[in-house]
Amino acid sequence: MLDKPATRPQMTRWQLAKFVLGRSFYLMVALLFIESALTAATTYLIIKAGRDVANDDFLTTDLIWILLAQGGAYAVGAVSWIFAERAGFGAFGRYMQRFARDNRHETKLLHEKGTREVVEPFLTGETFHIFFQLVYELEADLKLFFHLILNIAVIGSEIDTSFPVAYGIIFVVLIGLQMLARKPVARANLENQRMTNRMTAQGYTAWDNVFAGNRYNLRLWLAGFKVRLRDALRAQIKAIRTRETVSTVSGIFALIVIFIVMVKVSIQNAGDTEVLVMLATVLPRQIEMTKDCYTLAAGWNDMVAVWARLGGAVDNMYPDPDAAYDARIKYDRLVLREDEQAKTVGSLDDALKLVYGKRTGRINVRGGNGSGKSTMLAALKASIKNRAYYWPTTDRLAFQFALGTELVDDDEGIDPELLAEAGEPEQHEAVKKVGFSSGERQLKSLQEIVRFTDASIYLLDEWDANLDPKNRAAANALVEKLASRARVIEISHRDAA
């Protein structure tokens, strides 16, 4: 007996997030640390210059060293972006490879429109943006963390040890605040993602409803779109409000604490000109660091948002097929015709026995509309897996003959102002490429299947649907060629009575 469908094991968020790890990511982290170390060196040189001024020993070389250190930090930071991009693209590539590998045998999901509407946005861009948001947030947060830690160490050792203590208190309080706010922020961001995906999914039916020219259908489509648009806007505003409230409170708290410490140090060293001058020279850096604390808090909230969005990608990594999928097949309305014999089956097991009964030959699946012919072919593929080649009724499968024939506008969606700044015209002439009619695609696809595939079983769904009599005869000869070397189970109009 066939196993009953069970819930598939799910990937964790940590497993998905680890796709960004690799040589590029580690090099990015190393460069960020070097950049922060050079920035901390600049802080030290500024303090040293202030001390020299207080002691009437200031030299022009102090400025040169500051220039070299800070300039080096800028250069290293620029290089780190290259590896950040490589890490993001590598993560998305690994995600697509894993999705393809782990879902290639779930043929029962091919025609599940509801599941496809939910999962497809993650394949067409959502997960790509999630990975890059993750990489960018990690880059920004690590840069801030290294920057704060190293600069705090310099200021604490050169001016006053109260500053490291103050920043330590700030970190503890901010982490506690973020932990308290984590669930509300995550819930708001997850709802925002769901509503946004729901809104963008509506766009997949825009073309049909607009260009069909029917006022009735267009009115219904626009009404549905407006509802989803309003829901997405409300969810977006709620997510931003929740996130920014926590971040603002964190930033103000950090600013108050650091300025209290600065005032305290100034009072304690009122007669020490050297300390006061050094404190004054790092005042801009101190203000910058309080801003960094606020930004780091906001970055933590953004990381929570990315973590929530990772949950959406994880939830849709392994979609479950309908547990009652096989029940859609109306076996009492199906006839499996081989040669001159017509046979009936009562279950998918019976159909598999008939398929495995011979190594070659053709079985034509007959039945009325809604009897489950295509459903049975998909169920057979899900059971037979790699030994079967399945050709469904879709023209979206990748074939060699079609590579490079699609009319793709590389400038689609690009801001015209960006094209103008680059010195390129806003409208490009479409490159004329060879196109194929549905019948031509059908025949060429079948020719490629015969030539380049070597399965023991072929499942062909409506292979002659778009063919004229001449091309149907040519296609039938190709199917016969397949049947001479393998088992062919087909849905076709061949010899239809």
Describe these PLM feature segments.
Residues 274-277, 281-322:
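Cytosolic ends of transmembrane helices, especially the final helix of ABC transmembrane type-1 domains
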Residues 104-151:
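Juxtamembrane loop-to-helix connectors within ABC transporter transmembrane domains
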Residues 378-383, 438-458:
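GG-anchored amphipathic helix commonly corresponding to the ABC/SMC/Rad50 NBD signature/C-loop
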Residues 91-109, 115-120, 190-230, 306-313:
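Short cytosolic helices in intracellular loops of multi-pass membrane proteins
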Residues 25-76, 155-165:
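Transmembrane helix-loop-helix hairpins at lipid-water interfaces of multipass membrane proteins
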Residues 1-39, 84, 129, 145, ...:
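Membrane-integrated ABC transporters
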Residues 37-47, 139-182, 237-290:
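A hydrophobic transmembrane-helix motif
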Residues 18-23, 125-135, 214-259:
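An intracellular "coupling" helix at the cytosolic face of ABC transporter transmembrane type-1 domains
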